[in-house]
């Protein structure tokens, strides 16, 4: 029976081009998952966008002497182009600086406020002694008081994942000029997490199928739960929709309050962009719908605690009760699973644009194409542990696995069939060896599919490649090149090549979620016509919204910007064996995965940072 599956993908921050570490965490895994779900016959809604609020953009805009919106516009376009080039099949990839997003964020806040889960409290805020300027928490860095990491931020330590306040830091310093900040009293809106703790605990304890590291970390957060500030002393962000606050341009909603609402606002935007304004409700209000959230491990807190708390409070499901808001009919669905990846490093160091330790997605795509990067991430990415990227490992995997194992299987199988028959040959009687291979290949659909469904992407692609290896062993044992020299063995030649072609078709289907670009080429080589694996498109749209936000500093109405969308219903691929038909005309195969120069294993391309 068909299911509805919401695939919510972490929002990349619009302060620069994305590097391969970013897409290893949120991009490729989520796309493999979404493509598989569509192939399996499920209704998928995959949403995300660029995150364009918060301190880092302000700091960078000041350094570059430009406005924050101009900076966000620049990198929004670059990120959209790069992610579309990688084949990430979003139904909508939008941005947080839209009028629709502001309005939906304000609706969530208002519901929480009306239900008593958003309360004001005087807290300690930081200011610059030299300028008197307010320093939001992400302007401040220092030593984490919990794990001792030296570069913890004023809202969170990325090393241990714990939430912090700026005054918690040991030896705090300003990111702008390095000076020690002063702390003064300031009033903010707090999300009353203690009032939602019981509901959060009940929900989390039912998530027994989550990755153990994610569940354990999330449950540990509840041991010291306290109200969390959801506003900031900053002039860039969503206005606070409360009288006396909404026209104060010096206070805005916290970037992480609005960023997680983006999954909902993007779904709502997608619905009215396709002309069916209530379509989003099928994924958000139907209790049978499933929702999966993909991100790096540094964002677990916001997806397993803050976002569920916002949803519960908006629905009046905390200890204070309350009325469900207009978007909850009867409720907004909580995450089915939070799928967190670990970090991808480079030669043992964290990716860092400022330090030159970075490989940008667009540079990688120009040099090697999308499927090479997708393959490396799927087979060697940081699925459950931190993983190190080296050019040596990349070259080895592309040459020995993708080119030698899979590319060689396709090339020699189709080449022999094309040379000897020009079409898919009609087989004779199948031997035990033929039937065994075909049965093993057919069984792989369940194995690979189950693994992808459980977010075990490495295990899935490993099984698909194992079948490719078995087919290569079969061809080596059957020796069709010898059969081709004996006219009396022509029927047996046809049978062997038919069997091998069927397995090539099977493996191509199994690899389609992982390698959609080469899958389309192989489909055509095997005589297929039309769209096998649909790709996303970049579309220019106008910022307009059926909901009107309030306050000062709103996005300009009517401006245009790029989004990623796609019609994935037009593709032919399904998650099942496609029976090849004798007589189907074949095409002469072309090299799919050119072997990489072994010298690249030493230092990578000329544009790449030098490995140490």
Swiss-Prot record:
InterPro entries: Anticodon_Met, Met-tRNA_ligase_1, Met-tRNA_synth, Methionyl/Leucyl_tRNA_Synth, MetRS_core, MetRS_Zn, Rossmann-like_a/b/a_fold, tRNAsynth_Ia_anticodon-bd. Belongs to the class-I aminoacyl-tRNA synthetase family. MetG type 1 subfamily. Its EC number is 6.1.1.10. The keyword Aminoacyl-tRNA synthetase applies. PANTHER family: METHIONINE--TRNA LIGASE (PTHR45765), METHIONINE--TRNA LIGASE, CYTOPLASMIC (PTHR45765:SF1). A motif ('KMSKS' region) lies at residues 350-354. This is Methionine--tRNA ligase. Zn(2+) binds at residues 144, 147, 157, 160. It is an enzyme of class 6 (ligase). Residues 580-612 are annotated as: Disordered. It comes from Corynebacterium jeikeium (strain K411). Keywords: Aminoacyl-tRNA synthetase, ATP-binding, Cytoplasm, Ligase, Metal-binding, Nucleotide-binding, Protein biosynthesis, Zinc. Monomer. A motif ('HIGH' region) lies at residues 12-22. It catalyses: tRNA(Met) + L-methionine + ATP = L-methionyl-tRNA(Met) + AMP + diphosphate. Binds 1 zinc ion per subunit. It holds the Pfam family Anticodon_3. One of its GO terms (cellular component) is cytosol. The lineage of its organism: Bacteria, Bacillati, Actinomycetota, Actinomycetes, Mycobacteriales. It is found in: Cytoplasm. GO terms for molecular function: ATP binding; metal ion binding; methionine-tRNA ligase activity. ATP binds at residue 353. CDD domains: Anticodon_Ia_Met, MetRS_core.
């Amino acid at each position: 029976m068909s299911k509805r599956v919401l695939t919510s993908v972490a929002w990349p921050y619009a302060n620069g081009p994305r590097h391969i570490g970013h897409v290893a965490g949120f991009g490729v895994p989520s796309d493999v998952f979404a493509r598989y779900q569509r192939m399996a016959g499920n209704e998928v809604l995959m949403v995300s966008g660029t995150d364009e609020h918060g301190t880092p953009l302000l700091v960078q805009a000041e350094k570059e002497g430009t406005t924050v919106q101009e900076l966000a516009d620049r990198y929004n376009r670059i990120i959209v182009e790069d992610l579309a080039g990688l084949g990430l099949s979003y139904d909508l990839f939008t941005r947080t600086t839209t009028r629709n997003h502001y309005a939906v964020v304000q609706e969530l806040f208002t519901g929480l406020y009306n239900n008593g889960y958003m309360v004001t409290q005087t807290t300690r805020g930081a200011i610059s002694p030299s300028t008197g300027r307010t320093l939001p928490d992400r302007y401040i860095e220092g030593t984490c008081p919990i794990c001792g990491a030296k570069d913890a931020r004023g809202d969170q330590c990325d090393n241990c994942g714990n939430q912090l306040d700026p005054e918690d830091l040991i030896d705090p310093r300003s990111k702008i000029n390095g000076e020690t900040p002063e702390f003064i009293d300031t009033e903010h809106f707090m999300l009353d997490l203690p009032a939602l703790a019981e509901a959060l605990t009940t929900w989390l304890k039912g998530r027994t199928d989550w990755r153990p590291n994610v569940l354990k970390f999330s449950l540990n957060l509840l041991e010291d739960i306290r109200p969390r500030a959801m506003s900031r002393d900053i002039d860039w962000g969503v206005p606070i929709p409360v009288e006396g606050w909404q026209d104060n341009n010096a206070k805005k909603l916290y970037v992480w309050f609005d960023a997680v609402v983006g999954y909902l606002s993007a779904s709502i935007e997608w619905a009215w962009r396709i002309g069916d304004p209530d379509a989003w409700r099928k994924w958000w209000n139907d209790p049978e719908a499933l929702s999966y959230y993909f991100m790096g491990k540094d964002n677990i807190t916001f997806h397993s605690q803050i976002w569920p708390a916002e949803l519960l409070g908006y629905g009046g499901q905390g200890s204070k009760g309350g009325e469900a808001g207009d978007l909850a009919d009867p409720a907004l669905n909580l995450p089915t699973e939070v799928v967190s990846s670990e970090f991808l490093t480079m030669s043992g160091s964290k990716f860092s644009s400022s330090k030159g330790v970075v490989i940008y997605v667009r540079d990688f795509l120009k040099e090697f194409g999308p499927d090479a990067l997708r393959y490396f991430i799927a087979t060697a990415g940081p699925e459950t542990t931190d993983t190190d990227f080296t050019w040596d490992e990349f070259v080895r995997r592309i040459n020995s696995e993708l080119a030698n194992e899979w590319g060689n299987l396709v090339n020699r199988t189709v080449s022999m069939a094309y040379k000897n028959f020009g079409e898919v040959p009609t087989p004779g009687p199948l031997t035990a060896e033929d039937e065994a291979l075909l049965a093993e290949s057919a069984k792989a659909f369940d194995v690979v599919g189950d693994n992808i469904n459980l977010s075990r992407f490495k295990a899935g692609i490993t099984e698909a490649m194992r079948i490719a290896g078995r087919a290569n062993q079969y061809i080596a044992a059957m020796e069709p090149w010898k059969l081709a020299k004996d006219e009396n063995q022509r029927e047996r030649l046809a049978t062997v090549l038919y069997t091998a072609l069927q397995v090539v078709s099977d493996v191509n289907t199994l690899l389609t979620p992982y390698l959609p670009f080469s899958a389309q080429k192989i489909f055509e080589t095997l005589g297929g016509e039309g769209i096998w694996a649909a790709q996303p498109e970049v579309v220019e749209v106008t910022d307009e919204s059926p909901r009107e936000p309030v306050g000062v500093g709103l996005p300009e109405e009517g401006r245009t910007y790029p989004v990623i969308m796609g019609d994935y219903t037009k593709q032919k691929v399904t998650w099942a064996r496609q029976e090849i038909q004798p007589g189907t005309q074949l095409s002469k195969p072309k090299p799919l995965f050119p072997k990489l120069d072994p010298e690249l294993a030493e230092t990578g391309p000329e544009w790449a940072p030098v490995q140490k």
